[in-house]
């Protein structure tokens, strides 16, 4: 069994070398196909991840007017410290909503610090200026469906300047994810079909060049599985070789994109898929797809031209 495998392996490698240019064309086709598959898969999976993150961040941001001190029990008035009659009016109105899970205060100073962390040196141009941000309440909803209701009710509360919710963004992101998924998978399927076709032609040339040898093998009683072996290995090798470059690109490029993009998402409680999880799974998937389309192309040629 082992000796037969190595014999098939040797025949497959010899055939790949013999049909050099066709092998290069088939490997290049697989490489381009898998590279584009990796790109589409990265976009599809991360878009779905971001859409899920947004949906899970079932919250509304309620900004307080600058002339309202809702989170302070005392205020400065005419040089004196007096009791704040507006204390927690907005907070209590939000907290008393039946659809609200929690309400958390976020001062404009805290928001300024977060923006400084996210923007880095770009935010330094505003140093020395008055803080343009607003105090806000972060309202967490009991369920995603409650977000719009909370946002509408919050707009009616006196002292509220603006209300933001992720409903529209989530809906747009889901539409984008659906669009990318449909067209991305369609294009990937077309590319895989082209790769299978080229591999099939490469194997066909090998079959034609060895047709007499194959006929003799059949006459002396060689089993179909024995005849198929070298050709299936040849197709698998083409797929395997074509998966190497896309896998290297995934490992390097995804790390760079993650480090560049993800830090701007963290401030919004969003995140791309971690490279430690995504890269190994994507690389394994590329090799599996490569071997599959290589073997499939080989199988199609054998079925069509050998009739075995």
Curated annotation (Swiss-Prot):
Sorted alphabetically, which keywords does the UniProt record give? Cell cycle, Cell division, Cell membrane, Membrane, Transmembrane, Transmembrane helix
- Give GO cellular component annotations, separated by semicolons: plasma membrane
Q: Does the keyword Cell membrane apply?
A: yes
Provide the GO biological process annotations. cell division
Q: Name one Pfam family in it.
A: FtsX
Residue intervals on the Cytoplasmic side: 1-24, 200-236, 298-308
Membrane topology, as annotated, equals:
Multi-pass membrane protein
Asked whether the UniProt record includes DNA repair among its keywords, one would answer no
Regions that span the bilayer? 25-45, 179-199, 237-257, 277-297
Looking up InterPro entries in the UniProt record yields: ABC3_permease_C, FtsX, FtsX_ECD
The effect of residue 109 to A is: Shape defects; cells are significantly shorter and rounder
- Indicate the quaternary assembly: Homodimer. Interacts with FtsE; forms a membrane-associated complex. Interacts (via large extracellular loop) with PcsB (via N-terminal coiled-coil domain). This interaction directs PcsB to equatorial and septal sites of dividing cells.
- Database matches in PANTHER family: CELL DIVISION PROTEIN FTSX
Relate the protein's function as given in its record.
Answer: Part of the ABC transporter FtsEX involved in asymmetric cellular division facilitating the initiation of sporulation. Required in maintaining normal growth and cellular morphology.
Protein name in UniProt: Cell division protein FtsX
Q: Which organism is it from?
A: Streptococcus pneumoniae serotype 2 (strain D39 / NCTC 7466)
